[in-house]
Amino acid sequence: MSQTSNPIYGLRRNNGFAGGSNPSNNNNNNSNNNHNGNRISLGSATRTSSIISNNLPFRQSLLHGNYDNAINNTPSTSSLQKQSQQQQQSSQTSQTKRRSTLLSTPATTTKRRQSMMGNNLHQQHQYGSTALRHSTQPSSSMNSQFNQALQHVSPYYNPTSYSSQTPSSQPSSQQYQQQQQQANIPSSASSSQQQQSMDPRPLKDKKYQELIQKEIIRYLIDYKFEIKTNIALTENILKSPTQKNFNAIFKFLYNQLDPNYMFIKSSIEQEIVTLLKLLNYPYMHTITRSHFSAVGGNNWPTFLGILYWLVELNLSLSTLNDDDFLADDDFDKIFIEYIWKSYSLFINDEEEEEQQQQEQQQQANNGGSGGGGGDKFYNDMKIKFDQLQEKLNQELNNVEQQHENLLNKYHELNNQLKIRDDALKKTVALEEDYMKLKSYNQNVEKMMPEWNKKLEQLSNEVISYEEQMNKLQDEKKSIEMDLQQRGISIDKVNELYIKRDQLSKSIEIISNKIDDLKEKLSGRSFDLEKNFDNLENLTNQYNEITNKFNYYYYQQIQQNQQQDQQQQEEEEEEEEEEEHQLIPQFGLKLDENIKTTNERRQFTRDEIFLNINVKQERQNLLNFRNELDHQILNDRSQAMKFNEKCDIEQDKIKDQQSIIEELKIQDSLMKRKSDDLKQTIFQIQNEFNSQIESLDQQIRETKSNIQSDILQLERKLRDVNLNKSLIQEQLIGKRQKIDEDVINLTSFILKFKTNIQEKLINIADIVQDQLKKEQQQQQQQQASQQLE
């Protein structure tokens, strides 16, 4: 399909879609593009209309996409053919089950309204436009699956045909890793993050690069790259490329996707990065903006992979037709046709004053109702809609009649089945009864001879029992005669027996009640003990948990004490006492006397626990939970900051890896230079060897002179040692004299000290005696004054 000649495709690639990749261009660009004679405004008439079919689950909008949804919704290549066959069958049988979406906004607003056409139209289901992608999840078999999908979509461009010619052209991931290790290339096994983000395509394999280059060149030739760009396609254009050639190829491939997009010359590298992000290029992590400064060299395989990925994307889109962009529902097709025609009128400025006057006159004739009933397109749409609705109503009536006939047949058959089931059940029951009766008759026939013997025994027993009854009656009469003679009647005896029976029954009832109460009390006491034990276990578990809380508070206090070490020790002790008083000591302690008490009453929660209020404990726990929540929020904010720092560091690591590769290239160049230096050094070494031999002779002569000088120095050293020993003896004598003088001085000082102390003691005694005398004189004077 020629993408430039399709009006629907051009509309979808207008500002409503392509503008999403560069919002600044949508707001500031007031230029107009001509498309098949229809003027399309890029700035003022910004409209979006996305119609997505349900037939192709992997076909979704291109530029407003989400790569994750595309991967999740993309079927595997092995099941694409089955799904296409099923979809063709379902499209022939039931077209009414399909739905589509039409999102339309006027030129002056940005609000989105859902398209509705009366109460009889199907409710439109909104789909968020997601990216059109094949299943390109990073795995070792991704390339084969992707090529199979392309073969299903476009058999002409089939990279697997080349692989059949060269079986070893696409090595496996294991072979590629071995090649990396042999070439001293840093593999991605150094860290788990790099393994997850590694591009599984063997882009650095030369055979694989040749296959990719052939595919790209074939695509460029078929779509007339040389004519449109005036750049000649040669074999070296993709082997030793330039920055200009890469930019031109990328522009051409992207314009195949979005013909209306305009590139900015000053910042094309930044545009490429943003466009790849919008297209959700799956290996964007391997590219940074610094790589675009030097496209060639070691960075070229990654850029070659970008171009090949764009070629595959264009090939997959080349199989789409105009019908793929239309709705599957007939009502939607009618409504879309109406919107398309009215939209083309709006874009071409064909809504002139004459049409407006006609609409106003027709609205006045219709009494102000109808809202544009004279519109030609609207009338056509209404006629088609009515015809389609009549057709569907007829089909629906036919289906309802068939449904009623089938229901009647179903009820008739169901009644017949019920009668048959009842008959079967009755026959089964009769057969069971017959078998039981037959077995019973057989048992009776077997027991017949034994019954005669038992009848004779029973008759003899009856005769003996009758004789015993006669004897007992005679005894009864004799006892009654005796009681009458004694004055005791039989009725009184019977009454006494009845009272005794009643009393015995009442006693039994009371005893049974007592036993029941004892059992209930024992069960209640057992339950109470069990509940008390459970409560004790719960308190122990609670205390174990709260010990951790107390330890947490203790750690906080220690931290506060370390921060306040500059204060005085007394103030620290006082603050520690106050802090210990303010610490909420978590924990509960049961009153063990509850088991032993005989009080018959119900204990409250506060009475069960010793010196602890449960409400206060609960309040302390709530405060502690609030503190923990506050700390968790702080920790999360710090974690977010750390994650941001990690992302920055990862970007730095990627840049450093690229620098390392460049340094390795420099290292290989330096090795070559070092080999050249080794040869020059070997020549210089030979020259120096000849010089060394001449210098050895000079060294021998100098050694003989040095030995004679050493002998002279040894003689001088002996003389110096003798002088040293004499000086040491003189110093020892002087030191002994100094020690004697020091001892004499110390003895003199001690004597002087003792004499002074004795004199001071005597003076103190004299002073005390004088004070006593003066005090006695003062007392005598006071006494004499008092007497006077």
From Swiss-Prot:
Chief location: nucleus
Coiled coil: 346-788
Gene3D superfamilies to which the protein is assigned, alphabetical: Ncd80 complex, Ncd80 subunit (1.10.418.30)
Annotated Low complexity bias: 14-38, 76-95, 155-197
Chain segments carrying region Disordered: 1-42, 66-119, 155-205, 351-373, 559-582
One GO CC term, this protein: Ndc80 complex
Source superkingdom: Eukaryota
Biased composition (Acidic residues): 567-579
Keyword flag Cell cycle: yes
Swiss-Prot/TrEMBL keywords: Cell cycle, Cell division, Centromere, Chromosome, Coiled coil, Kinetochore, Mitosis, Nucleus
Molecular function in Gene Ontology: microtubule binding
GO term, biological process aspect, one: attachment of mitotic spindle microtubules to kinetochore
Function: Acts as a component of the essential kinetochore-associated NDC80 complex, which is required for chromosome segregation and spindle checkpoint activity.
Subunit field text: Component of the NDC80 complex, which consists of NDC80, NUF2, SPC24 and SPC25.
Family named by the database record: Belongs to the NDC80/HEC1 family.
PANTHER family: KINETOCHORE PROTEIN NDC80, KINETOCHORE PROTEIN NDC80 HOMOLOG
Protein name (database record): Probable kinetochore protein NDC80
Lineage, uppermost ranks: Eukaryota, Fungi, Dikarya, Ascomycota, Saccharomycotina
